[in-house]
């Protein structure tokens, strides 16, 4: 190796190491060579797809995805002793998403670039071409069809093959080739199957999007602080960004209040909802367990064929058979009516507790004719009638009577003074303040100047003035 070639190689490798970061260029340890990773800049809304008639049978054949990043092309090279004065670098070009024919076309163009730069270093020109011109050179546009090269059609050639050999570049969808494909030995599509390729592309795209997000600055719309993306989180549907500290507090408040269905984007009127994975990343394990449990319960509540065991010590979900009102808990074996949640009673009407009479009456009054018939069938007409009558009586008593302060018996006052006597327990009480009166001297309450009802024995009593005047004249 001449000293000029040696110096040129060292300078070129040093320049590449200073231009590119460690993820894009790595110098080999034992030989004059290295590895470069070429990350292509894709146009916006770039789509990839697999056609339904692909050679490989896929469960999701015919799918289409919009991506922002594709896995890099990898150029591995070794510099011979007489580079750059006489010989080109020996290299291999590998990529997951380009077919062997397309990679071979790129290899051929790298050879042409060497011929143009013969006698001078060429690695930077190669890397710039691969990064900036690959898509245009191969006529790749969106949507781009993913394909795996068929090894049965491949006739490999060596790097010393005739330069006059023409290669089919392929297009955006990798057009069909009538003649046998010729593939360069240096072109490697390093992927096992089309299904693996799809998953690798999607995983890489997601990882790169996260990496770009983490390195940018965002303004949190809650605390109005500017923070790195690594300290922020975005909602997947709307892409609204907030800092993790604010979202953590927001999620914790909602979960403690039991509002697990309301972990929406804080942006007004935005319907985006946080995923369970995002919630788990921000809140503590105990709160996430509560969130997970309440979310499952709310989901089960939306299922018409799921009820809960009414036993307080159990409360496990029970599947309800269609057309059957009996539920049997698989945990405690309790048989219950799925309508009233009491012990199963066969064809007998459901029993209604006093607390539920008001709800039953309101439900019946607001129901249409069809729902009224269902309620009559479920509870029985006598129970419905009883509910209506009892609630009417209760409303009348609340409006026209007061309860005895001693025994609670409803008392109606028609006329007379405000000293009342309970018909149930015979207790004296004041109709104005509802206080109990002394049995020895019940009128002291109205004669005592310190009493709030002083001189109010006949307060609010309607007296016929004409009769009173007649009695005075007599």
Curated annotation (Swiss-Prot):
<dbReference type="Pfam" id="PF05773">
    <property type="entry name" value="RWD"/>
</dbReference>
<feature type="binding site">
    <location>
        <position position="309"/>
    </location>
    <ligand>
        <name>Zn(2+) 3</name>
    </ligand>
</feature>
<dbReference type="GO" id="GO:0016567">
    <property type="term" value="P:protein ubiquitination"/>
</dbReference>
<feature type="zinc finger region" description="RING-type 2; atypical">
    <location>
        <begin position="404"/>
        <end position="433"/>
    </location>
</feature>
<feature type="binding site">
    <location>
        <position position="314"/>
    </location>
    <ligand>
        <name>Zn(2+) 3</name>
    </ligand>
</feature>
<comment type="pathway">
    <text>Protein modification; protein ubiquitination.</text>
</comment>
<dbReference type="GO" id="GO:0005654">
    <property type="term" value="C:nucleoplasm"/>
</dbReference>
<keyword id="KW-0677">Repeat</keyword>
<keyword id="KW-0597">Phosphoprotein</keyword>
<dbReference type="GO" id="GO:0045893">
    <property type="term" value="P:positive regulation of DNA-templated transcription"/>
</dbReference>
<dbReference type="GO" id="GO:0160127">
    <property type="term" value="P:protein-RNA covalent cross-linking repair"/>
</dbReference>
<dbReference type="InterPro" id="IPR047548">
    <property type="entry name" value="Rcat_RBR_RNF14"/>
</dbReference>
<keyword id="KW-0808">Transferase</keyword>
<feature type="active site">
    <location>
        <position position="417"/>
    </location>
</feature>
<feature type="binding site">
    <location>
        <position position="332"/>
    </location>
    <ligand>
        <name>Zn(2+) 3</name>
    </ligand>
</feature>
<dbReference type="GO" id="GO:0022626">
    <property type="term" value="C:cytosolic ribosome"/>
</dbReference>
<protein>
    <recommendedName>
        <fullName>E3 ubiquitin-protein ligase RNF14</fullName>
        <ecNumber>2.3.2.31</ecNumber>
    </recommendedName>
</protein>
<keyword id="KW-0862">Zinc</keyword>
<keyword id="KW-0175">Coiled coil</keyword>
<feature type="binding site">
    <location>
        <position position="445"/>
    </location>
    <ligand>
        <name>Zn(2+) 6</name>
    </ligand>
</feature>
<feature type="binding site">
    <location>
        <position position="223"/>
    </location>
    <ligand>
        <name>Zn(2+) 1</name>
    </ligand>
</feature>
<dbReference type="InterPro" id="IPR017907">
    <property type="entry name" value="Znf_RING_CS"/>
</dbReference>
<feature type="region of interest" description="TRIAD supradomain">
    <location>
        <begin position="216"/>
        <end position="457"/>
    </location>
</feature>
<dbReference type="InterPro" id="IPR013083">
    <property type="entry name" value="Znf_RING/FYVE/PHD"/>
</dbReference>
<dbReference type="GO" id="GO:0085020">
    <property type="term" value="P:protein K6-linked ubiquitination"/>
</dbReference>
<feature type="domain" description="RWD">
    <location>
        <begin position="11"/>
        <end position="137"/>
    </location>
</feature>
<keyword id="KW-0863">Zinc-finger</keyword>
<dbReference type="GO" id="GO:0061630">
    <property type="term" value="F:ubiquitin protein ligase activity"/>
</dbReference>
<dbReference type="Pfam" id="PF22191">
    <property type="entry name" value="IBR_1"/>
</dbReference>
<dbReference type="GO" id="GO:0000151">
    <property type="term" value="C:ubiquitin ligase complex"/>
</dbReference>
<comment type="subunit">
    <text>Interacts with GCN1; interaction takes place in response to ribosome collisions and is required for ubiquitination of EEF1A1/eEF1A. Interacts with the ubiquitin-conjugating enzymes UBE2E1 and UBE2E2. Interacts with AR/androgen receptor. Interacts with TCF7/TCF1, TCF7L1/TCF3 and TCF7L2/TCF4; promoting Wnt signaling.</text>
</comment>
<feature type="zinc finger region" description="RING-type 1">
    <location>
        <begin position="220"/>
        <end position="270"/>
    </location>
</feature>
<feature type="binding site">
    <location>
        <position position="329"/>
    </location>
    <ligand>
        <name>Zn(2+) 3</name>
    </ligand>
</feature>
<dbReference type="InterPro" id="IPR006575">
    <property type="entry name" value="RWD_dom"/>
</dbReference>
<feature type="binding site">
    <location>
        <position position="430"/>
    </location>
    <ligand>
        <name>Zn(2+) 6</name>
    </ligand>
</feature>
<dbReference type="InterPro" id="IPR031128">
    <property type="entry name" value="RNF14_RING-HC_Zfn"/>
</dbReference>
<dbReference type="GO" id="GO:0008270">
    <property type="term" value="F:zinc ion binding"/>
</dbReference>
<feature type="binding site">
    <location>
        <position position="238"/>
    </location>
    <ligand>
        <name>Zn(2+) 2</name>
    </ligand>
</feature>
<feature type="binding site">
    <location>
        <position position="246"/>
    </location>
    <ligand>
        <name>Zn(2+) 1</name>
    </ligand>
</feature>
<feature type="binding site">
    <location>
        <position position="453"/>
    </location>
    <ligand>
        <name>Zn(2+) 6</name>
    </ligand>
</feature>
<dbReference type="InterPro" id="IPR002867">
    <property type="entry name" value="IBR_dom"/>
</dbReference>
<feature type="region of interest" description="Interaction with androgen receptor">
    <location>
        <begin position="361"/>
        <end position="474"/>
    </location>
</feature>
């Amino acid at each position: 190796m001449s000293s000029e070639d040696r110096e040129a190689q060292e300078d070129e490798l040093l320049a590449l190491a200073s231009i590119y970061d460690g993820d894009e260029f790595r110098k080999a340890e034992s030989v004059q060579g290295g590895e470069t990773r070429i990350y292509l800049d894709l146009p916006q809304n770039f789509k990839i797809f697999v056609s339904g008639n692909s050679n490989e049978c896929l469960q999701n054949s015919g799918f289409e995805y919009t991506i922002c990043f594709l896995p890099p092309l990898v150029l591995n090279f070794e510099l011979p002793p007489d580079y750059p004065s006489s010989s080109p670098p020996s290299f291999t070009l590998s990529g997951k998403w380009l077919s062997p024919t397309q990679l071979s076309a790129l290899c051929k163009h790298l050879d042409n670039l060497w011929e143009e730069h013969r006698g001078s270093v060429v690695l930077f020109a190669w890397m710039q071409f691969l990064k900036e011109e690959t898509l245009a050179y191969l006529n790749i546009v969106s949507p781009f069809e993913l394909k795996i090269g068929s090894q049965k059609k491949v006739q490999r050639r060596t790097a010393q093959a005739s330069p006059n050999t023409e290669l089919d570049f392929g297009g955006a969808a990798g057009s069909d080739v009538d003649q046998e494909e010729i593939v360069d030995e240096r072109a490697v599509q390093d992927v096992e199957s089309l299904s693996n390729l799809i998953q690798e592309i999607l995983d890489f795209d997601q990882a790169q999007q996260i990496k770009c997000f983490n390195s940018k600055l965002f303004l949190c719309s809650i605390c109005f602080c500017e923070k790195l993306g690594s300290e922020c989180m975005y909602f997947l549907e709307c892409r609204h960004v907030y800092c993790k500290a604010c979202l953590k507090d927001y999620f914790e408040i909602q979960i403690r209040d039991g509002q697990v269905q309301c972990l929406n984007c804080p942006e007004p009127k935005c319907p985006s909802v946080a995923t369970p994975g995002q919630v788990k990343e921000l809140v503590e394990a105990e709160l996430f367990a509560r969130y997970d449990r309440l979310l499952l319960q709310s989901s089960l509540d939306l299922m018409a064929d799921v009820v809960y065991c009414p036993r307080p010590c159990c409360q496990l979900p029970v599947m309800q058979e269609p057309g059957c009102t009996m539920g049997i808990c698989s945990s405690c074996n309790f048989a219950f009516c799925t309508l009233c949640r009491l012990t199963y009673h066969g064809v007998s009407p459901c029993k209604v507790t006093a607390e539920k009479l008001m709800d039953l009456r309101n439900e019946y009054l607001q129901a249409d004719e069809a729902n009224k018939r269902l309620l009559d069938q479920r509870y029985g007409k006598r129970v419905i009638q009883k509910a209506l009558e009892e609630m009417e009586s209760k409303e009348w008593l609340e409006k026209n009577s007061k309860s005895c302060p001693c025994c609670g018996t409803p008392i109606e006052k028609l006329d007379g003074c405000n000293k009342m006597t309970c018909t149930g327990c015979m207790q004296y009480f004041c109709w104005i303040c509802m206080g109990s009166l002394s049995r020895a001297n019940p009128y002291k309450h109205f004669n005592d100047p310190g009493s709030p009802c002083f001189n109010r024995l006949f307060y609010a009593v309607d007296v016929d003035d004409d009769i009173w005047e007649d009695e005075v004249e007599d």
